[in-house]
A protein has these predicted regions:
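ATP-binding N-lobe of GHMP and related small-molecule kinases
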Residues: 1-92, 110, 114-119, 156, ...
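Short beta-strand scaffold segments in enzyme catalytic cores
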Residues: 12, 36-40, 131-135, 141-142, ...
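Solvent-exposed alpha-helices and their adjacent loops that cap or buttress functional pockets
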Residues: 30-31, 126-127, 133-136, 153-157, ...
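Short, basic/glycine-rich phosphate-binding loops at helix/coil junctions
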Residues: 44-56, 104, 199-210
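Conserved beta-strand termini and adjacent loop/short-helix elements that scaffold enzyme active sites
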Residues: 51, 85, 137, 241, ...
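Contiguous, small/hydrophobic- and glycine-enriched helical/loop subdomains that border
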Residues: 79, 101, 105-142
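Glycine/serine-rich anion-binding loops at beta->alpha junctions
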Residues: 83-112, 130, 237-251
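Conserved, helical-rich catalytic subdomain that frames metal- and/or nucleotide-binding sites
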Residues: 137, 142-237, 252-286
Length: 286
């Protein structure tokens, strides 16, 4: 059994576009305690099961892609029955698919007694997806390149957070397609955020954080911008994670408007989640 933790972006900056079409980024990634769960059993063939009917269970799923990469690398023909209990919303900018793929790599390495090192798993992870290497370790990490160059940062305390997501998904590819690098008027102050992380004073991050994909997502889905502005007016410093549409904020339990906020969002059909920062990407239990 493996818990695969979701992630948020404390800052997301796009530096430029490479010749191969990928974007150069600087991202501060942070695990949160919202998680999927994978259960793996020995089996004669490779299969994936989930009750979430929106998810493919073939090669389009990163779990199967990860399993085939590890098979191809090692030459093993072992099978596995993988059951996915899905809690992280799909297409939400929370890295659920990447977390599941990382869990599959670690779980199959153990199930099939392959004894691959973490560095080998990280190389396989890059070939599965840009966020998968981060999900292997999790915690608080600075990612550069296309997201594969990772620097592990000091762990942040388990501060309470609040997430909310509209009743639709967002295509990351579509957001990047609509991103105009020349129109970005404010970049997150990564250097200052790194200094704050070193001190652990997470609440002072609000002056420096940012996500340059917000403008592109807001153009496609103006209701996300409207809710973000409404939350800001209510006194909640709020940001979008990834390509959206999920919004997140740090919160103190003493905020009197919080119940009203949750009620209104649910009235609008938005999903909500109260959780905390997490220091790991995965949790493996026998």
């Amino acid at each position: 059994k493996i818990k695969a933790f979701a992630k948020i972006n404390l800052a997301l900056d796009v530096i430029g576009k490479r010749e191969d079409g990928y974007h150069e980024v600087e991202i501060i990634m942070q695990s949160i305690n919202l998680h999927d769960k994978l259960i793996l059993f020995p089996a004669p063939v490779l299969s994936l099961e989930t009750k979430n009917r929106r998810l493919p269970i073939d090669d389009r799923n990163l779990i199967i892609k990860a399993a085939k990469k590890i098979r191809e690398f090692t030459g093993t023909q072992s099978g596995a029955r993988i059951i996915l209990n899905k809690n992280i919303p799909v297409g939400a900018g929370l890295g659920g698919g990447s977390a599941d793929a990382a869990a599959a790599l670690v779980g199959l390495n153990k199930l099939w007694s392959l004894n691959l090192s973490l560095s080998t798993l990280e190389k396989l992870a890059v070939s599965v997806g840009a966020d998968v290497p981060f999900c292997l370790t999790g915690g608080t990490v600075l990612a550069k390149g296309i997201g594969e160059k990772l620097t592990i940062l000091p762990s942040l305390p388990a501060e309470p957070i609040f997430l909310t997501k509209p009743p639709f998904t967002v295509s990351t590819a579509m957001v990047y397609k609509n991103l105009s690098l020349s129109s970005i008027d404010r970049h997150p102050d990564i250097k200052s955020i790194l200094s704050i992380i070193n001190t652990g004073e997470i609440y002072s991050i609000n002056d420096y954080w940012g996500n340059v994909l917000e403008k592109a997502t807001f153009k496609l889905f103006p209701e996300v911008k409207e809710v973000m502005q409404w939350l800001s007016e209510k006194g909640f410093p709020v940001r979008m994670t990834g390509s959206g549409p999920t919004l997140f904020m740090f919160r103190s339990s003493g905020n009197s408007n919080f119940k009203e906020i949750k009620f209104k969002l649910r009235e609008l059909g938005w999903w909500t989640y109260e959780g905390a920062l997490e220091g790991r990407g995965l949790e493996v239990t026998v």
